[in-house]
Amino acid sequence: MIVADSECRAELKGYLPGAGEEQRESRVRRGPRGPSAFIPVEEVLQEGAESLEQHLGLEALMSSGRVDNLAVVMGLHPDYFTSFWRLHCLLLHTDGPLANSWRHYIAIMAAARHQCSYLVGSHMAEFLQTGGDPEWLLGLHRAPEKLRKLSEINKLLAHRPWLITKEHIQALLKTGEHSWSLAELIQALVLLTHCHSLASFVFGCGILPEGDPEGSPAPQAPSPPSEQSTPPSRDSLNHSGGFEAARDVEALMERMRQLQESLLQDEGASQEEMESRFELEKSESLLVTPSVDILEPFANPDMLCFVEDPTFGYEDFTRRGTQAPPTFRAQDYTWEDHGYSLIQRLYPEGGQLLDEKFQAAYSLTYNTIAMHSGVDTSVLRRAIWNYIHCVFGIRYDDYDYGEVNQLLERNLKVYIKTVACYPEKTTRRMYNHFWRHFRHSEKVHVNLLLLEARMQAALLYALRAITRYMT
């Protein structure tokens, strides 16, 4: 995204975020102010900004000459960011079926579902820069009927994508004055899922607004004590709790090694056992929720005006005492065999870039864990990806979900589910309490997996509905 210039910021002063995404904590003035409320400024600025400059060149990112905070944090993983940036530019800046101002308005609608003031403010500025009608920023009721018709599918994609049916697609494509073409709808659906998942990344990494153009520091939430806010280094292992952290890492690595050996020896569970373990994991995910003392985010009226049915949110795919929708068997509609080919037919420019971005996140590895190097992390990355798909009701027949419980600690599960399903409830405490002994860049890596797995899950449901509509 592009940071608004000073003129646009002044014009949108009432809309732009001013105190960061962690709305439920007190603020104190600190300096220098970094791009994240969760990550020490010296770590993210040094590694993130340097990585971006080396791999892409700062001028390739921003015509304004400024790099936003999201890009700097994501720049901790420059190989992934390259793929992300290509798709982001295609969706929002390259010629396509939808006018540029419409794309930014759709992005506003998507980000508002999660009350993500960082993204809403950024896209408001870009909406005006691309010639958008300022009246539309007063709320959905001032936008064209054609855009308002996206509200229902925006709501479902953001919170319960498994409810999307071919009837939702038919209603949008039905011939009429305010109908969508299939090419327009595909671009809109990809953009909606892109922004929903990007909101997860913003909240999951504690991304802060850029501040005023003069660069004066804005209020920032106080950092917790250093032993909580920064994962221990090798030296800190000599301090209280350090040996316990080291043992946790060693235990995780041993479980990973055992799983990899069993896979090589073909000691996998039977199909019935794997299905049973998926159902167990899905049921147990009901218990993986944020603490009851987490307050509901304050509903910002400047964002609620872009939202219809604001009380609609994520509900567990399997709920006690209710008739659950059928499990989405990944083998019946895969990204590789079905989703990708459909996107390639209807939105060829986006299909290849989407696939590259998914692969960049899924395969990204530095073969390190905390203070250890030369580690094969494939089973851990797969467990995180498949757990995210599990909470969205997607099952892989060839995956043993017993691995999820062996590799993902409860604090990590709580964090993953919160960031993926209701990111606006994410807190610094959640971020600090999983993988305390890991580097911040490794936690950002988890957020990249979250972003892409969530986006792919929602897209699979939407593309399956389109396929059913077309057949």
From Swiss-Prot:
Maturation and modification: Phosphorylated by ULK1 at multiple sites. Ubiquitinated at Lys-166 by RNF167 via 'Lys-63'-linked polyubiquitination in response to leucine deprivation: ubiquitination promotes SESN2-interaction with the GATOR2 complex, leading to inhibit the TORC1 signaling pathway. Deubiquitinated at Lys-166 by STAMBPL1, promoting the TORC1 signaling pathway. Ubiquitinated by RNF186; ubiquitination mediates proteasomal degradation.
GO function terms (MF aspect): L-leucine binding; oxidoreductase activity, acting on peroxide as acceptor; peroxidase activity; protein sequestering activity; protein-containing complex binding
UniProt xrefs under InterPro entries: AhpD-like, Sestrin
Domain of life assignment: Eukaryota
Cellular component per GO, a single term: Atg1/ULK1 kinase complex
Sorted UniProt keywords: Acetylation, Cytoplasm, Isopeptide bond, Oxidoreductase, Phosphoprotein, Ubl conjugation
Region (Disordered), start-end ranges: 212-241
Cross-link (Glycyl lysine isopeptide (Lys-Gly) (interchain with G-Cter in ubiquitin)): 166
Cellular compartments annotated: Cytoplasm
Assembly description: Interacts with the GATOR2 complex which is composed of MIOS, SEC13, SEH1L, WDR24 and WDR59; the interaction is negatively regulated by leucine. Conveys leucine availability via direct interaction with SEH1L and WDR24 components of the GATOR2 complex. Interacts with RRAGA, RRAGB, RRAGC and RRAGD; may function as a guanine nucleotide dissociation inhibitor for RRAGs and regulate them. May interact with the TORC2 complex. Interacts with KEAP1, RBX1, SQSTM and ULK1; to regulate the degradation of KEAP1.
Protein name according to UniProt: Sestrin-2
Species for this entry: Bos taurus
